[in-house]
Amino acid sequence: MIEIISALWPVFALILLGYVARRTGFPGESFWQQAEKATYFVLFPVLLVSRLATTDMSVVDLKATGLIVCLLVLMGSVFAFLVRPFTARDAAGFTSIYQGSVRFNVYVGLAASATLFGSLGVAVGAVVMALMIPLLNLCCVLVFSFFTHKTGKFSAIPLAIIKNPLIISSLIGLTLNQTGIGFPLVIEPVAELLSRMALPLGLLSVGAGLSFRVLLNSGVEICWASFIKLMLMPLSAFGLCLLFGLDSQSAEVIWLYAALPTATSSYILARQLGGDAPMMAAIVTGQTLISMISIPFIMIFLGFLQKSL
């Protein structure tokens, strides 16, 4: 228990620090957008390639992990549709509930998994991301298409998925690993320094994107989406990992990813495709704040449950 709390509190401390820094105008509004771009397009991809290329992937059960990820997305979708009568005020609002129920924050996930589980955490997390990001984007686009009836920008989504730097870097890292090429020794010291920058800057950017003002008008929606994403999803992940006989450490990484708050990019997708962007912003902020308590709690609870079985 102490180990989990000790490992996770710096992650959430950096998120809060990012929030405080932006609200106090430090180091300037223009900094945060550029910081997020640098993290997303350079620092995180370098981290993923370097870790995946050098990690022993024989300890990762790719088949079981893939099946668990697909089933988790399906279960999250079912949960979201089941609570629809109790939540969204309109069709656009439901798209925000849906995204809040299934998507996950990559920055928090990579930082927490690296802190808790080291290279194995990054490796399993990268496999989860490589599978889940395209699948979730496809599901979200289908939900938007059905509920908002907007088609103008949907053609750009497949290309955006293919060009996603996190997917590309995961595939490059896995290729270097599986072909035996490994990571080039010449650039390894540079990659190591860039990798160390990725997690703190990414977490600061998450905090900088939070806004408490948006929480005022979406209380019911935040509660339902958070209940699904932060409680039902990790419990479902626990059951699936048990069902497929996944090793304990890989299972813990999957629990963690299932328990993550929804992605900050959900707001952008809601704005682009006709969803309820203010509600989405409220869910992102609410879940990020709640997850500071829920993630340590659920990880400790599931760890205890696993040992008792």
Regions of interest found by a model, annotated:
Residues 1-309:
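Alpha-helical transmembrane segments of multi-pass small-molecule/ion transporters
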